[in-house]
Every structure is written in structure tokens, then in C-alpha cells.
């Protein structure tokens, strides 16, 4: 059996000598609290300075949002000066948005899990809730340039190491790290790996239920953020975690390129630090 040496690194040595910081949380729930608290603290600090907050945010993982709602409503932290740019959305075959009422829609999902639950007097103003729009991809950069900053980009990491839907180059596709990091907000096909894990997580394994296309905020815009925060809460994140931290900088594992960012950190659960050495796993023993 050919085992990648990085998969043999003991869990307590992960992140050593990596330019990307690692914060290991005991459980998935602890991770969600830490992420929510950092988002809240960033907003609160800007509020106290009389400054606006602008973030690129995900739809997933969902866990931080319920905790952020609780923190905002309990401690009365205003989001009125926030601009949230969601990082991606699914598209139809004609590269238009899927219906907002589709269970898979991130636009509809953000309303259900976050915007509809924050107290009105504290909520992000409707005009400051953004998604990248097919045909108007340039507007994401315009929002960031108008704000003069991007406080944070945070979100989950895909099974192939992607961030948002910044998918790795396809086999045989030539792309340098510099070229990949210069890719802006755009429409693109969803990779087979992403379709597979997303249908496993959300559609009972029905591959055909996952759309073929998406729109994503690009790595070009992500790198403008003061802080990059990646969330890896699941056991299936274990392989990508090690590649990101110890596999070298490569577009084949997009998040590995955040080693070039001055403030990039991964929040992971302890289960994600386990070695991904192959074994036959028996579920529901």
C-alpha cells in the first residue's frame, strides 16, 4: 500500500512549520462557536471604532450562523454597518440562479438560517446583503474597492481543498499558482468531487440532484481580505487538512495557496486531525 508520508504525521504535530495557522477544536460544536465569536468580535471592534464591516461569508458550514444569531441578539451587537457578500451559489444549466425556494439555494438558505432570525433593529440592511450575480461578476470587486477593505473571508473547505467554489484545475489543465490566485469572481462547472460530497451531504447520494454549474467569488478577491478563516469540522476533511498544511502550495489543493496570505487560519475539529490512512470502516455496527 502506497501511503503519502503526510498522512503519517501525528495529530499533535499538524501545522508545525506551516505558514497557515491551525486551531484544533475538541468538537464540531466548539469549532462553530469559535468561528461565530471571531466574526462577532470583528464586527464589534469595527462598531466601536465607528467603522463599517465587510466580509465574504459562506452558506456552509451552517453551524456558526445559529450561534452568531444568538450572540447578536443576546448581546445586542448591531449589524447595521455590515456588508455580507456570500461567496457562491448554484446555477441552472443556462447559468442563471437556481430558484431561491429550491432547498439547495444558498440565497434562500441565508434568509432561513440567519437573516430571518436576527432581530430587525440589529440586522444587516437588505441592501448590504450580496451574492455574486451571473453577468455582473465585476460588482464583487466594486463592493470591496468602495469599502476600501475586506475585513474577513471565512467558510468551509471542500473535500478537494477548495474555498467557495474555487475548484482545482481539471486533470491536464495547465494553471500556475499565480494564475489561479488571479482568478476573479466567475461562473464555472462544479467538479465531480464536489458534486459527489455535496450529494452525499445534502441529497441522499443523488448525483443528478446537484447542479452542474455555480458562481463563486474568486481567489483574487479572497486574497484582499485582512483575515482568511477556513472551517474543517468533519472526518472527511482529514485528507485535505494534511494536504493544505503539509502538501506544498499547489492549485490542485486551492486552500494550500493561503500559505501566501499573512493571516490565514484553519479551525478544525479533532476528528479532522485523524490520519486518513485507508481502512475499511463499518457504519452502524
Regions found by a protein language model. Give the residues of each.
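Gly/Ser/Thr-rich loops at beta-strand to alpha-helix junctions
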Residues: 55-64, 159-162, 235-237
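Glycine-rich N-terminal segment of FAD-binding domains in flavoprotein oxidoreductases
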Residues: 44-76
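A short secondary-structure junction signal
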Residues: 141-142, 163-177, 240-244, 278-279
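Ligand-binding beta-strand-loop-alpha-helix segment within the catalytic cores
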Residues: 4-23, 29-32, 77-154, 209
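A glycine- and small-aliphatic-rich helix-loop capping segment at beta-alpha/alpha-beta transitions
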Residues: 68-78, 101-102, 168-177, 247
